[in-house]
Every structure is written in structure tokens, then in C-alpha cells.
């Protein structure tokens, strides 16, 4: 092979590589991939709208039924209208029981776990994986309902992110903005006094939306820590929002939380995600 042929071959190979795009990028329409997220294999259901060349990312978190595929499907309307690439990971129960999923892996058997092992850090790894596949630092938002909302509230309280918006829909419990209440239902017993104040302030400054179905009022909670926050999912959301707002005002801190309510809807991810209020909840 002469020099001219070698140069021509190299140029053509480079051209092909540049035009081929990311090998494992989510396809147009629905998809399913098994992803190694920092050593943890996870199934991720995806949706990419047609006619949307550079979508931002929406990571969706399922409830206790762990039906990530359904949650992916519930957000397709949002994705089409807002140009969103949807990724809905499955947190399998065997690997992610309640303490490690909805309560964030912060505390197990009353013992605070190593911060490097908190489950929310997997979200950062998953976002990094998507960015590598897309070959660009796309912006992202997080959306969770029920147990997925509980998980995202622990993430918002304990794990710094670059999320444009973190939407917590109809969560069964929250991290109450207090250092007097032990984690994972408050921020207590995790930090030193100085670090705790900084963590509390950062929590209130998060771009967090508490998104509530006004009909989610059934008193079906058997957890005393959650019941201390209110007698229903709806009331707990109202109470934690008001407590956060009042504390921020008292301390002179920025308060970036938003409260969005949906009349006539109870504990339904499908209805919450398909309502016009979902756009308000997700807006940066």
C-alpha cells in the first residue's frame, strides 16, 4: 500500500467514525439496554422522540412495583413535546430493597452508611454513561413517583447533582428539613454541626418540585416516621414544603423548591405524568 492509499484510507475511516454516531445511543422510539453502572448491571428502558436531534435527558424513577417500562411509557407525551430522551432504570428488589432504594441507602439498621455507597451516586454514574453514549454533556432532569419520589428526595438532600429540576411526585415520605430528625427522614446524625448546616442550606437551594395529586389522601402508611410528617401523602408533601419555605425565610437562604398540585388525581403515575401540570413541575 503506497502513501497516498494509506492517507486516503485513514481519511475515509475517520470520516466514517465521525458520522457513525455513538454506538450504544438510544434508538429512535422505545428501547431497552442493560448497562454497567459503575459495576452494577441495570436494565434501562429508553425513549427517543423522532425529529429531536439533540434532546435533553429525563431520568424517570419507578415506584415500589418497579415497573420502569410502564414509567418510560407514561412519559412519552412529555418527551415528544419537550424534546426529551427518557431513561428509566430498573432498581431490582434483590439488589435495592427499601432501605437502599426509596430511602437512598443512607442508613441501614440505624447505622449511617459510607457516603460513597449511597444509592443516589448511581444516578450520577447513569447520567455520565448517557452523556458518553450521546457524546455531549446534555442537560438533565429527574422525575420520580411514589417510591421513586422518596428516592429522589433522599438524593436531593444528600447527593449534589447538576439536575435542572428534580420532581418528586406523591412520595410516601420525605427528608424533613431538620437536623433534629435522624436520616433518612431528616438530615440528623449524618454530619457534623457545621457540615449539617451547609447540607441543610444546599437541600433548600435544590431545584426541587413537590408535585402532588390532591386526591392522594388515603391513610395507608404504616411507618411511624412517615406518619409524623402527615397523615397522607398529600399532607406530607404540603407540610415538608411549608417547613422548608419557613426555614429558608428564617435563615435568609435561597429557597428553590416549587409546589405543584393536580386536582382530582390520587396515587397514579400515569395521570400525574400526562397532566398539563407535569410541564410546570418539570420546567427549569
Residue ranges and their predicted role:
Residues 1-11:
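Bacterial N-terminal signal peptides that target proteins for export
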Residues 52-55, 60, 64-97, 176:
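Short substrate-entry loop that stabilizes the transition state in hydrolases
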Amino acid at each position: 500500500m503506497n502513501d497516498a492509499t494509506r492517507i486516503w484510507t485513514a481519511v475515509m475511516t475517520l470520516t466514517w467514525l465521525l458520522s457513525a454516531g455513538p454506538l450504544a445511543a438510544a434508538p429512535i422510539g422505545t428501547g431497552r439496554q442493560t448497562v454497567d453502572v459503575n459495576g452494577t448491571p441495570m436494565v434501562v428502558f429508553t425513549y427517543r422522540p423522532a425529529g429531536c436531534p439533540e434532546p435533553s435527558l429525563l431520568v424517570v424513577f419507578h415506584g415500589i412495583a418497579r415497573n420502569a417500562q410502564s414509567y418510560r411509557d407514561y412519559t412519552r407525551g412529555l418527551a415528544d413535546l419537550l424534546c426529551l430522551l427518557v431513561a428509566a432504570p430498573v432498581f431490582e428488589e434483590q439488589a435495592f430493597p427499601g432501605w437502599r432504594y426509596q430511602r437512598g441507602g443512607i442508613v441501614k439498621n440505624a447505622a449511617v452508611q459510607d457516603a460513597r455507597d449511597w444509592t443516589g451516586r448511581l444516578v450520577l454514574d447513569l447520567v455520565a454513561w448517557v452523556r458518553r453514549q450521546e457524546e455531549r454533556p446534555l442537560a438533565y432532569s429527574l422525575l420520580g413517583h411514589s417510591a421513586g419520589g422518596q428516592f429522589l428526595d433522599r438524593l436531593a438532600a444528600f447527593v449534589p447533582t447538576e439536575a435542572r429540576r428534580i420532581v418528586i411526585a406523591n412520595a410516601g415520605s420525605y427528608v424533613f428539613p431538620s437536623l433534629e430528625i435522624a436520616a433518612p427522614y431528616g438530615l440528623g446524625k449524618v454530619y457534623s454541626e457545621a457540615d449539617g448546616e451547609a447540607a441543610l442550606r444546599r437541600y433548600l437551594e435544590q431545584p426541587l418540585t413537590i408535585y402532588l395529586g390532591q386526591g392522594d389522601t388515603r391513610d395507608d402508611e404504616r411507618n411511624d416516621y412517615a406518619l409524623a410528617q402527615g397523615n397522607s401523602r398529600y399532607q406530607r408533601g404540603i407540610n415538608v414544603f411549608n417547613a422548608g419555605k419557613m426555614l429558608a425565610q428564617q435563615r435568609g437562604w435561597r429557597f428553590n423548591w416549587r409546589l405543584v398540585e393536580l386536582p382530582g388525581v390520587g396515587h397514579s403515575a400515569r395521570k400525574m405524568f400526562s397532566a398539563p401540570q407535569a410541564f410546570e413541575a418539570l420546567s427549569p
